[in-house]
Amino acid sequence: MDGEDFAGKAAAEAKGLNPGLIVLLVVGGPLLVFLIANYVLYVYAQKNLPPRKKKPVSKKKLKREKLKQGVPVPGE
């Protein structure tokens, strides 16, 4: 192998895309698409889905809250 031949190949490879840029595009592109799609779905869900139903409050907790407020609990 000649030194000139090696220098010619290096010059030809240098004209191509930077490998770091390729890795950045391959990893960053899908990641960016994923994040944007998640945001779009989140906004869509906030507008169109009904609000969550609240969990039923237990009678024990209801009694405790009424005692805190000073309201007499019926049956006692």
UniProtKB/Swiss-Prot annotation:
GO cellular component, as recorded: nucleus
Record GO terms (molecular function): DNA binding
Keywords: DNA-binding, Nucleus, Repressor, Transcription, Transcription regulation
Composition-biased stretches (Basic residues): 51-66
GO biological processes: regulation of DNA-templated transcription
Motif (Nuclear localization signal): 50-55
Intracellular or extracellular location(s): Nucleus
Name of this chain's protein: DNA-binding protein S1FA1
Protein function: DNA-binding protein that specifically recognizes a negative element (S1F) within the RPS1 promoter.
Keyword DNA-binding: yes
Main location per the UniProt record: nucleus
Similarity comment: Belongs to the S1FA transcription factor family.
Family annotation (Pfam families): S1FA
Region described as Disordered: spans on this chain: 51-76
InterPro entries in the record: S1FA_DNA-bd
